[in-house]
Amino acid sequence: MEKKTSCLLCVLTALLLAVLYLWAALRPGVWLRDAFLYRQADGSFSGRDAYAAYTMQIAQTENGAEVEFTLDGETRRYRLESKAEGMSDPGVKIEQDGVVIFTGTALGDPGDAILWREDDGGLADEVNVIVNGEYRRSDLWPSCSWLYHVAVGGRRETRGSVAFLLPIGALVVLLVLDVRFPLLFWNLRHGLEVYGGEPTDWYYAMQRVSRITGTIGVFVLAAMSFAVH
């Protein structure tokens, strides 16, 4: 009876952890470098990283979108026009607080498009990399490409990488089978070779090690799913 109670508690704990993980991993939003901006109930986005706190409001327009982006209390307003009048198709124009900061074209799917400048044919944005925590405040603002992907292209992501769900699920299934049927893998390997044999103490020792390793692997993969994007 005591063993059944312990097993039931373990199962309930595992289910609770699984539900909490899925809830956290599948929360919608969008990545801005290493900051994840969670989608809120009112349609806005907010999040923070080691450098600043961010909020964003997006309003769709007839041929693009308007974005209000706040960084640590400072707000900038962007207007994005796709297929802007007098421009090539698909022409893009982006304004920041009424000043044009980009005109050019978008190549590819809007959610992952490459933006090319009309004047010099170069990419819309410079690549800014924060090294050893050294940065300029201007590096923290969203790039033209990111704004286009999110506001016009409708890019949406989840907090955790869903690519990790398959290996996590596979490990969990193997652990459940090994606990529920302790001799399953031994029988699969030796059942046709040995009749009436028994696993050795070494087998049981390695089985315990594999269970511990598998459990650690599940938590490591779960943690990695939040770090990789």
Which residues does each predicted region cover?
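Hydrophobic secretory-pathway targeting helix
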Residues: M1-Y38
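Generic detection of intrinsically disordered/low-complexity segments and helix-coil linkers/edges
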Residues: L15-L17, A25, P110, R180, ...
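Short, flexible coil/linker elements and helix-boundary hinge sites characteristic
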Residues: R27-P28, G43, Y195-G196
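Long, solvent-exposed extracytoplasmic domains/loops
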Residues: D34-G154
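Cytosolic-side membrane-insertion boundary helix
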Residues: H149-P167
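Alpha-helical transmembrane segments forming the membrane-embedded cores
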Residues: A163-H229
